[in-house]
Curated annotation (Swiss-Prot):
Superkingdom of source: Bacteria
Species name: Shigella dysenteriae serotype 1 (strain Sd197)
TM regions (residue ranges): 22-42, 50-70, 76-96, 121-141, 149-169
Annotated membrane topology: Multi-pass membrane protein
Location in or out of the cell: Cell inner membrane
Alphabetized UniProt keyword annotations: Cell inner membrane, Cell membrane, Membrane, Transmembrane, Transmembrane helix
Classification via PANTHER family: INNER MEMBRANE-SPANNING PROTEIN YCIB, INTRACELLULAR SEPTATION PROTEIN A-RELATED
Function: Plays a role in cell envelope biogenesis, maintenance of cell envelope integrity and membrane homeostasis.
Protein name, as recorded: Inner membrane-spanning protein YciB
This protein's GO CC annotations: plasma membrane
Family: Belongs to the YciB family.
Amino acid sequence: MKQFLDFLPLVVFFAFYKIYDIYAATTALIVATAIVLIYSWVRFRKVEKMALITFVLVVVFGGLTLFFHNDEFIKWKVTVIYALFAGALLVSQWVMKKPLIQRMLGKELTLPQPVWSKLNLAWAVFFILCGLANIYIAFWLPQNIWVNFKVFGLTALTLIFTLLSGIYIYRHMPQEDKS
């Protein structure tokens, strides 16, 4: 259910883009993200920090897109979110000395410290590369290609990287945890 809620604004954005234009899609994205946030609060009495940050960025960059009637702002949102994710992962590892991935999954998984560090760094690099790819596609290719990349390309890349991370984790789990 939660994964569906996370992807709902993206689906709404894509549908409105295909039916109308980038500005209607941006408006729909803001509304859908707000509805999902409100629903999460009412249903689960909890809103995740990243969902709240994403909502704020959607409102800010979406609002700028609509106010200035300039789609470059909504295109930057993707890269800014990925930069924040990468930054949080790197700060957790290099400043706080405990990888964010370990903080998020450490209660469920037992892994050696170097594995947590490599996994954390891999996700940071992944987010940086996705942000850079977004910049290139958003500003050098036609808008419809960027929308398809944002909706399908980044989603597929994230799913593939999640699967690869799962394989990496499984390979490094203690033998008794694998069964």
